[in-house]
Amino acid sequence: MGYIRGKVRVIIYEAESNYKVGVLKVKETNDKGLEEFLGKSLHFTGYFGTLQVGDNYEMEGNLIYKEKYGYQYNVTDYKKMEVTGYEAVIEFLTSDLIKGCGEATAKRIVDTLGNDAIKKIKEDKSILMTVPKMSEKKALKIYSSIMSNSSVDDDLIKLKEMGFSINEALNIINKFQKNALSIAKTNPYALKEIIDFKKLDNIYLSGENPDETLRVKNCVLETIRLLEIRNGDTYFYLEEIRDGLKTYFNIVDVDYLEEVINSLESNKDIYREEKRIYLNSTYSMEVEIAKKLNYINSLPITGKNISMIDTEIEKLEEKLGVTYDTEQKTAIKRSLENRISIITGGPGTGKTTIIKAITSLYMKMYNLSPSNVNSYIALLAPTGRASKRLSEATNLGASTIHKYLKWNKDMNEFQVDEFNQNYQRLIIIDEVSMIDTNLMYHLLLGLTNTIQIILVGDKDQLPSVGCGLVLKDLIDSDLFNFCPLETIHRQSENSYIPYLAKEIKNKDITSDFLSKKDDYNFLRVDNSKVLESISRVCELSIKRGHTDKDIQVLAPIYKGINGIDNLNNHLRDLFNPKSDKKREIKIGDITFRVGDKVLQLVNDPERGIYNGDIGYIDSIVSVNNTKTLNVNIDFDGNLVSLTTGEMINVRLAYAISIHKAQGSEFVNVIMPVCSSYYKMLYNKLIYTGVSRAKKSLMLVGTVEAFLMGVNNNYSMDRKTSLKDQLLKYI
């Protein structure tokens, strides 16, 4: 049967059934009909067990063509290709380390000089001239590159033979220097901070005489980490870990698991508290958060006469032409009087109004001016869009937490820490429900003990993506000044959205939710008609002069007919139809087009773009008149140029997930509510989606699905210890 051989470049999609979609760079084939793909990337689909990015595979199957996706290779059988010395040397010669050596040249070198070609070239550079089609200029360039990397090339090739890519091998050598190869051979799990754990596990299992106990120990730690990501808990019980080992690593019937846990505890890798089992790092973070917050909260506010606040609030009301109600005045005053305060409320309750009042009063009390205010006050939020809203509301500078802490993407660490702290006096953090244990810990490390902290958020929104329930635990501890806002202050008397959000939160939906309002409508259609109905609504909006900047579709899941991916494919052709004047580029399974609305998926502080930022593709351009293309994206005035590799972290944004929308607001929101979403349609998710709408909200789907979701408490419970630690370290 025909086959293709090559390196897996990326896994685009992976289902629980082990069905995968990926991209293979084709290096070899025995099928003449596939020779046109040699040296090119080809999409493949099929059912796979373990499939590692960067590894080489032989795949059997047949080429198919789909109008929507183009050519794909439908895989019926596959096997991993063992890395030989021959292939490892070629990989090294064709890497970015060696100048002037393409794949054809590399093969001729190894075919002529053998697997020890590098050694021979280092001993006698003239030997390169025995290679067919070799020029003196090219030989000198290759020799110079080899010699400049002579200290690492042997280890690079040996690490490549073990299964690491050249880039991975370089990272290992840079981190562990002369011990790199020894560590990789004896305990590759020590590389887990820089290399994917599953790849390390496969490399260890394929080595000589793997130690089962060493593997189980490391798999236990990785299982707990994966459970933290999946469940959001900060601790687990033994049976949960046992089940996780089976799920993630097919490790079953470990009769000595208790001994492994005890050993990991002795090594301070995990922490046990009765039946609770934590990663030691997570446990320590909860403890340190509790200690620091309690210490800060114990310090008095000094330097100003607090009794003057009431008078200053009255002056501010007169200046701004507003009247704060009792609830708002209490929140403003108490936040200025206490070291740590928590202000929570749903949409329309005036959280932003209160932040503006607090910053204005603080500047007045401490005689601050716009020129020096940033030295005294820091306004922060978890996302770029939320920090921008904060800045617009207060007319002051605001920042993401990652930018404030000077996060280094390459090193994956914050430059601001306990040894290099920021020295503002007041810090106000919005959208606190999005902050997980890890981020809160690092934020507090970067703050002095004399800081004044005001935490603002909506306790009924989705919890953080990372583990923990920081906001809820702080409130439940009853140790800090807590100001809940219940009264809705929405400018329009006919505004229904905040009232609907409140009904969803309280699970007390009235029949009024079926009636059309000035800012709300429930379009009742069957699941099979949801996509068509949303498309029709958007078509009508376009005819009325609206653009994709005015409308945001929010959905809970990516796959399926009513999932985000399918919604994006349909909506893009409405808002940004194909045109000969609009250049396109296909990356993975997504075709990007000039003018497309796109979403950034990861933080990139050096470029000033962050997870959740929305931008528009400005242009797709050739780099230095080559075939290499870059994509220029305008993120609200910040024009960023991304390589095709970096575009893996970008998605179409005509429809986005409700999780990604958290921390943002949109003028008009359309939200499908389908029974096909099943468990992923739950109370906090619906509440969060509804509360993203500023001017209008349209729900599209069935009443049954909506009510089912409102009454579904999925995701509300997480096992955390921050509250316990707060009470312990008062």
What are these regions (language model features)?
Residues 1-16, 61, 617-618:
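Structural detector for short beta-strands of small beta-barrel domains
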Residues 13-26, 624-632:
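Short aromatic-glycine-enriched beta-strand elements
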Residues 15, 24-215:
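Long, highly charged, low-complexity intrinsically disordered interaction regions
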Residues 66-68, 246-307:
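Interdomain "pre-motor" coupling segment immediately N-terminal to P-loop NTPase/helicase cores
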Residues 321-337:
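N-terminal pre-P-loop "Q-motif" helix
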Residues 342, 353, 357, 361, ...:
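Conserved helicase motor core of SF1/SF2 NTP-dependent helicases
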Residues 351, 370, 460-599, 604-607:
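Conserved helicase motor core of P-loop NTPases
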Residues 613-624, 628-730:
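C-terminal accessory regions
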